[in-house]
């Protein structure tokens, strides 16, 4: 089991590092620019990808496997990871599953269309402290589920 972080604009990297360290997991921090990572942990691996669209997503989708965990706010990337047998967790603690990913993709597309039509403005709610707590719980639950073989 390894953890893959879609690092660009990820507000829970530090929390993910701490949980992964406690479980002695390898963490791949993938982005198109350097982000801070713990220098004293050899299990944390920084991956810098080109600045082309979806380069980080493509790298993660190519390298992730069954039993791994992806941390991302990108719903299409979460869907790609699920197809490979990995777990996917949003940065607000929402666990994406085979049962929920279709609805999440549909809502994403609907909101994009409504924004383009001017029917709604803005994006998702700001990241809140409760999101951090939900994320920590979701990551721990995902790790335990993989360890139990689910």
From Swiss-Prot:
Matching entries from InterPro entries are given as: UPF0178
What domain of life?
Bacteria
Q: Supply the Pfam families for this chain.
A: DUF188 (PF02639)
**Xref: NCBIfam families:** PRK00124.1
- By what name is this protein known? UPF0178 protein Rru_A0086
**Sequence similarity:** Belongs to the UPF0178 family.
Q: Where is the signal peptide?
A: none
């Amino acid at each position: 089991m390894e953890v893959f972080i879609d690092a660009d604009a990820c507000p829970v990297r530090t929390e993910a590092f701490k949980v992964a360290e406690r479980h002695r997991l390898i963490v791949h921090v993938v982005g198109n620019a350097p982000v801070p990572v713990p220098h004293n942990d050899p299990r944390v691996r920084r991956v810098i990808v080109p600045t082309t669209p979806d380069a980080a997503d493509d790298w993660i989708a190519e390298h992730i496997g069954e039993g791994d965990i992806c941390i991302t706010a990108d719903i299409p990337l979460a869907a790609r990871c699920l197809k490979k047998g990995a777990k996917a967790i949003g940065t607000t603690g929402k666990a994406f599953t085979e049962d929920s990913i279709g609805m999440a993709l549909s809502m994403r597309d609907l909101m994009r269309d409504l924004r383009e039509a001017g029917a709604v403005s803005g994006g998702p709610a700001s990241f809140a402290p409760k999101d951090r707590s939900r994320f920590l719980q979701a990551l721990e639950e995902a790790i335990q589920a993989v360890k139990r073989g689910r």
